[in-house]
Amino acid sequence: MTDYLLLFVGTVLVNNFVLVKFLGLCPFMGVSKKLETAMGMGLATTFVMTLASICAWLIDTWILIPLDLIYLRTLAFILVIAVVVQFTEMVVRKTSPALYRLLGIFLPLITTNCAVLGVALLNINLGHHFLQSALYGFSAAVGFSLVMVLFAAIRERLAVADVPAPFRGNAIALITAGLMSLAFMGFSGLVKL
């Protein structure tokens, strides 16, 4: 049980995919202008990352390794992610049309989110078993969502703040992301993975 807790805390805070591994920066910068959009994208990404991690582990363990097709791992994982994203898009469209319109083009772009593929590949490279793979995917997604929601809240505050003209827009957003990364670096001694 302690191992799972350490894996969760380590993945969410210490080895955050956005601020430490620099994966998933496109949606991090693109969808984080409004808190509501960031929360919706975070939920969709959490669902996709968790399900894609589980499916990728199953396909790797039951199909690719037994058939000695591990050289197709990346291609297979991309296909798995595309299927999971299409499934997620259908679910979001049916359950929350407002969120579907709000996310717009960013929902299909989860397919190209390198953090989702990174989680699937890192699960295999780190030698996680099924439960660890599911928890690692969920933890990475929680960390991604946490950072995106925090960043969106800060960006909403910055939109009404008196920021000097040269720093308005993306410049202050990048500075803020750097400061957030430094803040998360404070967790680096918390857990050793």
From Swiss-Prot:
PANTHER family on file: INTEGRAL MEMBRANE PROTEIN OF SOXR-REDUCING COMPLEX (PTHR30335), ION-TRANSLOCATING OXIDOREDUCTASE COMPLEX SUBUNIT A (PTHR30335:SF0)
The entry's keywords: Cell inner membrane, Cell membrane, Electron transport, Membrane, Translocase, Transmembrane, Transmembrane helix, Transport
Protein name as catalogued: Ion-translocating oxidoreductase complex subunit A
The keyword Cell membrane is assigned to this record: yes
Cellular compartment(s): Cell inner membrane
Record-linked InterPro entries: Ion_transpt_RnfA/RsxA, NqrDE/RnfAE, NqrDE/RnfAE_oxidrdctase
Bilayer disposition of the protein: Multi-pass membrane protein
GO terms, biological process: electron transport chain
Gene name linked to the record: rsxA
Stated role: Part of a membrane-bound complex that couples electron transfer with translocation of ions across the membrane. Required to maintain the reduced state of SoxR.
A GO term from the CC aspect: plasma membrane
Similarity remark: Belongs to the NqrDE/RnfAE family.
Short name of one Pfam family: Rnf-Nqr
Membrane spanning residue stretches: 5-25, 47-67, 72-92, 102-122, 134-154, 171-191
Description of how the protein assembles with itself and partners: The complex is composed of six subunits: RsxA, RsxB, RsxC, RsxD, RsxE and RsxG.
UniProt-listed Enzyme Commission number(s): 7.-.-.-
Enzyme class: translocase
